Amino acid sequence: MIKLHQYAIMCAPTTSQWAAVEAIRNCDDSIDNMRKEYDMRRRVMRKGFLDMGLDCFDAEGAFYLFPSIESTGLSSDEFCERLLFEEKVAVVPGTAFGKCGEGHIRCSYAYSIDEIKKALKKIAHFVEKVRNEKNV
């Protein structure tokens, strides 16, 4: 079962790869519209993190951002666990991608803009609460 799971998540499934080839060959406006939509989502999410005072590299070509949460004083694991339990928002600890990921979280913007905005509000509330705890 583990091997099956590993092969399923290692790369895009063959059917998805063939679908991508077909989309490229028969390119139409929907691809450009989708690219613009994801660009807008990325910009909204990045601005949200910057407004919270979280440094965030401006990634291109992915569906994820990797903001720094070092200013909260929490480890990546603690931040993610508390955010999940306290605000019901799931993000991935940076340590899932190696030691250098400590102090960061990975956030997907492959959601609707409304869901992204809701999540950003909850993350902002959590970050403010954690910073206030540090100052008490």
Which residues fall in each region the model found?
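PLP-dependent class I/II
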Residues: 1-136
